[in-house]
Swiss-Prot record:
<keyword id="KW-0328">Glycosyltransferase</keyword>
<dbReference type="InterPro" id="IPR035518">
    <property type="entry name" value="DPG_synthase"/>
</dbReference>
<keyword id="KW-0735">Signal-anchor</keyword>
<keyword id="KW-0808">Transferase</keyword>
<feature type="topological domain" description="Cytoplasmic">
    <location>
        <begin position="27"/>
        <end position="215"/>
    </location>
</feature>
<dbReference type="GO" id="GO:0004581">
    <property type="term" value="F:dolichyl-phosphate beta-glucosyltransferase activity"/>
</dbReference>
<comment type="similarity">
    <text>Belongs to the glycosyltransferase 2 family.</text>
</comment>
<keyword id="KW-1133">Transmembrane helix</keyword>
<dbReference type="GO" id="GO:0006487">
    <property type="term" value="P:protein N-linked glycosylation"/>
</dbReference>
<dbReference type="InterPro" id="IPR001173">
    <property type="entry name" value="Glyco_trans_2-like"/>
</dbReference>
<keyword id="KW-0812">Transmembrane</keyword>
<dbReference type="Pfam" id="PF00535">
    <property type="entry name" value="Glycos_transf_2"/>
</dbReference>
<feature type="transmembrane region" description="Helical">
    <location>
        <begin position="6"/>
        <end position="26"/>
    </location>
</feature>
<keyword id="KW-0472">Membrane</keyword>
<keyword id="KW-0256">Endoplasmic reticulum</keyword>
<dbReference type="InterPro" id="IPR029044">
    <property type="entry name" value="Nucleotide-diphossugar_trans"/>
</dbReference>
<comment type="pathway">
    <text>Protein modification; protein glycosylation.</text>
</comment>
Length: 325
């Protein structure tokens, strides 16, 4: 085999490899968003249906409203939950206590908690339904199979009734009273733009209690996040973010990333749509059992590469009109 034949073989292998990579990328880019799957006709087997299942309706399944309908309450608290039967009771107790206290001081302060059960294998669903028996403001949105934290947040926000929508983790790492700081900030932003996002930041608060290893890994991930297109945000991954209803309408029907790294994509979409985005410090403490495995970080890195490529080349298009369904 001479040199030129060797080069031809290398070129052929390179073309085949490139073709496979492009094919995979195109397939990934063509995947519909969760929003698209909720809009499919009733007889389509891929259609996603979400139901609220609290008593006193018994076993009756009641369809959720959508974020495209008029708001019914002041704030929706969206809580993604996967195998959280042990941790979510404490979080719900603290949240309900805070919300009832606010409600007692201000009758116009209306609220709901939407817990999105993301295919839990434990008793998370039953625990939440028990709370729903006592509190008509608590709803269960059930995903029969695990689809990822991003999918859970997306589903909850697409079906929120609130004028404001807060995503908050089930582990209670950020205390719910930090909501007031985000609430004050988003009201300032909404004076000039009703599409607004406020990001809770652990990086800006010295009270954030993280181990050195977590800080180091977080720094490496932040470099990838910047490359994905996020600008001006120090901490994209804190599970405490507040959205205006108008922002929710645009963000979550365009979200593609379904698992851990959905937050940067939301910020990329918001930036491209000219939304007002702000970041403020929150008190946050690392909770036992909240650590991410190395395999999870690798998947996050892949998601960030997808965001950087697909949004830049237009494979993931952003719909810039409201869709009322």
């Amino acid at each position: 085999m001479n040199f030129w034949n060797f080069l031809e073989i290398l070129l052929f292998i390179g073309i085949v490899a490139a073709g496979l990579i492009v094919a995979v990328m195109i397939k990934t880019a063509e995947d519909t968003t969760l929003f698209d799957r909720t809009q499919l006709p009733e007889d389509n087997p891929q259609k996603l249906n979400y139901y609220v299942q609290p008593p006193p309706n018994g076993d009756e399944k009641v369809p959720f409203p959508t974020v495209f309908e008029p708001a019914k309450v002041y704030t929706t608290f969206v809580v993604p939950a996967y195998n959280e039967e042990k941790r979510i009771p404490k979080m719900l107790d603290e949240t309900v206590e805070y919300l009832k206290s606010r409600e007692a001081k201000d009758k116009s302060f209306t609220w709901e908690i939407v817990v999105v059960n993301d295919g839990s294998k434990d008793k998370t669903k039953e625990v939440v339904l028990n709370y729903a028996k006592d509190y008509p403001n608590i709803f269960l949105l059930n995903q029969p199979v695990n689809m990822g934290k991003g999918a859970a947040i997306q589903a909850g926000c697409l079906h929120a009734r609130g004028e404001l929508v807060l995503m908050v983790d089930a582990d209670g790492a950020t205390k719910i009273n930090e909501f007031e700081a985000l609430e004050t900030e988003i009201k300032k932003l909404m004076k000039n733009n009703n599409q607004a996002i406020v990001v809770g930041s652990r990086a800006q608060n010295e009270k954030a209690n993280r181990t050195p290893i977590r800080k180091f890994l977080g720094l490496g991930m932040h470099v990838l996040i910047v490359l994905s297109g996020v600008r001006g945000i120090h901490d994209t991954q804190c599970g405490f973010k507040l959205f205006s209803r108008e922002a929710c309408k645009m963000l979550f029907m365009n979200q593609h990333v379904q698992r851990w790294c959905f937050d940067p994509e939301l910020l990329v979409i918001g930036r491209r749509l000219g939304m007002k985005i702000s970041e403020i410090p929150v008190e946050w403490n690392e909770i036992e059992g909240s650590k991410m495995k190395i395999s999870g970080m690798i998947k996050m890195a892949i998601d960030l590469i997808d965001i950087a490529i697909f949004h830049r080349v237009g494979a993931w298009t952003i719909r810039d009109r409201r869709i009322n369904k």
